[in-house]
């Protein structure tokens, strides 16, 4: 019977390629430090694709992103640290991320240079200034992505969304783009192995490099006009329901 895990050589090769990618990326992070938005977006896309390629991770876009202007608030379900690379590879933006990521190698610096807003999830006092900062970023025409679950899940369902940060889209009169992320193994079944909901980053990374094949599917589900929502709770509900429907679509074949 063949193993459902990658060989030790494959795991080692992936880790080596990731190390090389981290080293090269660390030397070229200035490419996403401010400057021309088009140049920054190209650099962010290249970083996202490079990280996934180093780990042999496939990326598929199901429902494509609709035509829309810049300055969009992007809301997605949160499964893994790979989410940021997958989304960056197909839809470059700034991110709202937990404070801890700021100290991560490369990813933290990449986030800082790309305009990521780092938040303390345990402090409600951060919400108002963060919404103000995100609103200003949206009004400048820059896209901002965030994970309204506020923490990672298994990826086979959704945790309840938080409404607070949707206020920035209402204040800016911006569109909100709903994105669903799903992870598949070598058999085409949904998998929770890339999730770091219950493990640390090193264990999660080892799980990922140990998989024979991993594919991330990105679906751009719908666009909501924040100005048409009664309040941030109604806006949150609309986005949450649309993402939940896609995430739950084939979760029954998960392994």
From Swiss-Prot:
GO cellular component: plasma membrane
Its EC number(s): 2.3.1.51
Domain remarks: The HXXXXD motif is essential for acyltransferase activity and may constitute the binding site for the phosphate moiety of the glycerol-3-phosphate.
InterPro entries reported in the protein's UniProt record: AGP_acyltrans, Plipid/glycerol_acylTrfase
Keyword Lipid metabolism: yes
Organism: Neisseria gonorrhoeae
Bilayer topology annotation: Peripheral membrane protein
Name this polypeptide is given: 1-acyl-sn-glycerol-3-phosphate acyltransferase
Motif extent (HXXXXD motif): 78-83
